[in-house]
Amino acid sequence: MNDFSFQFSRLADLVNANCSEILIVGGKVSLSRLNEAIVFEVSRRKTLRRLFDSTGNTGQENRHTISPQIGVIEQEVSSHAEAELRALLVANIWENSVPVHRMHGIKAFCIAFRNLTVLQFVTSHLLSDARAGYELTADVVDSYNKLADGMELQAANIESWNGDLELRLSSLDHIRYFSIAAIRILRDFVTFERGTTMSKFVPSARDILKHVFARNTLALVLRKRMELGVTLHPILLTAAVKAWAIHKFGRDKIEGSYRIADMYSFRRYASSDIQNAYDTMVMPFFPRIKLREDVTQTVLQLQRALDKEKHGRIFAELYRQRLYRIANQVLPKNFAIQLALRCIAKTELIITNAGTIELGHTRFGNVEIVDFFSFPQLFPPGRMMIIFNTFADELRATIVYDAQRFARSEIIKLVELMEQELQLIGDDSCRQIGAAIAANDPAEPQPRH
């Protein structure tokens, strides 16, 4: 086995190991295991350096030696995992515990980007060899296949987390897309016939490797999480929506400067810097429906659309009474008039979907919530979107708004009013709303498989 084959085989062994393996005890993250994982990852980095440095210079020119690229592996693979673990440790101390579903989301997030980093390294090396006229040996092909097998296993693990926890974090679909893309590119590289040019593989590789979500957004997420100590939920939601919009519409079709704010973040951080973490170009991609003018039919159609898309339920009366009153207090009167149901019924609504919630997080106070619930966009498309869901045993409201149309002070006021209104929701009123909905549509929502 030549030097490169040996090194790459060892590299595949190291990378396929789970860099962010953490023991979850009783639904919480073990602080001692977090520390152990950090120490282990630092040791892994040293092992990588010793491995490649020891075989990098033998006195003879070996163009297959990959020791010059060890900086890529060390900085982009290991440091990402270490940064994730340290951020988790900080979050654990700050919040006393990290919910299981958040841990799985962060873990999947880390694995997906490690896959992309390895893919970038492999692609660069293969292109360099192809230009130099080298052919892939059987040993090297075996190593590439071994690495691709590891990526497939990791992608399968993400699928199993989704099924076991009945969890659909906004990021998981996109993470799965990247993992599958990485596998496809690797398979393409190792199965081409000898003498075939590499050009047909280059565009697909570049499209993935230069994707904004794979590079810029990751740096933003890691940097801002470390600086501000913010939770992953709102930032990852922003990044996922942004990336999915680019994937669906193309970069040129994204317009408007959109930001995400949620009352949980504003309540914990009275700092103007918090908005910088959410400052990104976002154009949400959600299904749209055309509503009828009849009020009763509109409410029923809206409820059926939500049930069909998310297998959830909508508190129609809460939607009409509470949130419209909030909007009337904080927004100009002429704009608030446009929010009347008779006007909204004549235009398109974007149906929001914050994703399902983990089993065990289905209660708001003493009120049990079936699956999860969201509200349609209160404002004309492109202006504002309010997403309701439950997160970590509390009701969460996330606002996606156009920074060019709304002042930050208005959004903060809106968040405060929403929080006050939501605290006024009693058991009796919720039961009455639930009974009204059940009377209109008695069928229970079917769980997503």
Identify the function of each model-found stretch:
Residues 232-241:
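Short amphipathic alpha-helical segments
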Residues 128, 141-148, 226, 240-249, ...:
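Hydrophobic/aromatic-lined pockets within catalytic cores
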Residues 1-59, 81-106, 246-449:
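Acyl-thioester-dependent acyl-group transfer interface
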Residues 62-75:
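Structured interaction and signal-relay segments at domain junctions
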Residues 86-87, 99-147, 157-168, 389-406, ...:
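Histidine-centered acyl-transfer/condensation active-site motif
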Residues 125, 225-232:
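Alpha-helical hinge/cap motifs
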Residues 1-10, 127, 131, 135, ...:
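Non-catalytic, low-complexity flexible loops and terminal extensions
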Residues 41-42, 225, 236:
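A generic structural signal for well-ordered alpha-helical segments
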